[in-house]
């Protein structure tokens, strides 16, 4: 096919039991070194033997191996890191706290962020990319102008900054028109009548009341005029990606579903570090992918990239097995084990034993922990194989 | 609306016909309830999938070229 090797060499390699990726790797090497058919045969046989030898054996305790393989490097991770690393001037939880947060399937991460990719026409120019920034970053009144309260006349006065208005609403020409929109938003949210004079807005409570006036100012500060409420900040960076140089946005705060719907956002590549949002928006399979990506990056950032990806894939498979994201731990996987003894061995021993006694539960002793507790051979590996003599006898 | 299936994190989901399914279950020697599950309201589920159906998911695997897995549609 795409490899420049003789048919003989090609067939020899194709006939092995290797998976596609390994076959391609062997083919590429054969092409590069220009091997003969007999050499190819030797290589293919050796690679195949090595491959078959390193496959997981039947009855191998893969879960235990994964637990150890993730747990050991975990001891080398920094206990508490809160730094500005990875993304420019942004605070992202890393290391052990992040790993714990992932396997615990915490509802919201400590520092939710989104990585927003842009569609071609927005990704090339900074100006266009900024248009998308203002559609995502929440714009509140304090960013738009100065608020002053006049207690004598019972009015709140807002002096809108023309430059800021023009910057955040690049598609509207006149600042008066933008100020009008702002006024409408305030009316809609606070239920007051706003009087507009150019870019100066004024309003007050219907009845003169000092308390109500202050309350209006409080509420005014919370109104989102543009963008997504959950996103407090957006950082724009020029990056080298597989599509060449392009602008990528990093957000502080996340609202994955809303972000994907925004015009200019590339809904095929944009991602979010909250696995629950990914689950809700893209489904369980995407959540599984996200768990693998997030755990692997967390380990890689700590220089622990030699953890085999298969261990993380197993963790993600287990966490997404029942169609929802389940945490690893007392409230998730371990807490739902069938065996009383296994659950009791994990956490809050007495409660589990007491509940089991009250409900008259029995234990089938199928798992590892139960058998260790009662001192029976564990039903794993050679422990799960029974040997029996053949029933037929041969006479001489 | 955003087309979820176009996202790079979402692998291809297709509903499996009964005949192929029987073959798969025989291969693994399991009952369909022993398969991993997928919720009926999952955004990536094809429109023609019903509760009790099995979807075939073809993942772009990290360890081999493609990995085919199955999920039973529930609830």
From Swiss-Prot, chain B:
Its main location: cytoplasm. PROSITE patterns: RNA_POL_H_23KD. It catalyses: RNA(n) + a ribonucleoside 5'-triphosphate = RNA(n+1) + diphosphate. Its EC number is 2.7.7.6. Keywords: Cytoplasm, DNA-directed RNA polymerase, Nucleotidyltransferase, Transcription, Transferase. The keyword Lipid metabolism does not apply. It is found in: Cytoplasm. It holds the Pfam family RNA_pol_Rpb5_C. GO terms for molecular function: DNA binding; DNA-directed RNA polymerase activity. GO terms for biological process: DNA-templated transcription. Coiled coil: none annotated. One of its GO terms (cellular component) is DNA-directed RNA polymerase complex. It is an enzyme of class 2 (transferase). Part of the RNA polymerase complex. Belongs to the archaeal Rpo5/eukaryotic RPB5 RNA polymerase subunit family. DNA-dependent RNA polymerase (RNAP) catalyzes the transcription of DNA into RNA using the four ribonucleoside triphosphates as substrates. This is DNA-directed RNA polymerase subunit Rpo5. The lineage of its organism: Archaea, Methanobacteriati, Methanobacteriota, Stenosarchaea group, Halobacteria.
